[in-house]
Amino acid sequence: MSRNEAPEQRTTQPDPVYRDDMVSRFVNAIMRDGKKSLARRIVYDTFDVIEERTGEEEGLEVFKKAVNNAAPLVEVRSRRVGGATYQVPTEVRPERRITLAFRWIIQYARARNEKSMVNRLASELVDAARGEGGAVKKKDDTHRMAESNKAFAHFQF
């Protein structure tokens, strides 16, 4: 193990349109093969579609609500103790909460059967903001797993 201090955290620049760090991170999560301009276009067009669908609500607010609804508080991690592997519930760090929410929203948006990624992402974000959709279901499943394995919580990491 290294005796050095922990490396300093990298920070992402806020995105140029909304001046929001979370949107910038979401663009990076959407991006494939380094095509950031395409990822930005998908995210910004998604926010426009959300505003059209919901009417009065702003796309950024729906996005933040969706991420908050899809972010897990606890997760289970495998821990090997004396030949047996236990699923130990652990609290999720704030950074990881948001990262998991992004990952799940994008995963379930890509699995939808709609024409473009913009429409699929908009539908998933609107559903997640309402407390529905695949990403929120995944969060609930994760919480359920942690609840059912509460007995192993004393095997903390």
Curated annotation (Swiss-Prot):
UniProt entry tagged with the keyword RNA-binding: yes
Coiled coil: none
Record's keyword terms, sorted: Ribonucleoprotein, Ribosomal protein, RNA-binding, rRNA-binding, tRNA-binding
Pfam families documented for this protein: Ribosomal_S7
Cited CDD domains: uS7_Bacteria
Highest taxon listed in the record's lineage: Bacteria
Single annotated GO MF: tRNA binding
UniProt key word rRNA-binding: yes
One GO CC annotation: small ribosomal subunit
Swiss-Prot/TrEMBL GO biological process terms: translation
Family: Belongs to the universal ribosomal protein uS7 family.
Subunit description: Part of the 30S ribosomal subunit. Contacts proteins S9 and S11.
General function of this protein: One of the primary rRNA binding proteins, it binds directly to 16S rRNA where it nucleates assembly of the head domain of the 30S subunit. Is located at the subunit interface close to the decoding center, probably blocks exit of the E-site tRNA.
Name of the protein in question: Small ribosomal subunit protein uS7
Gene: rpsG
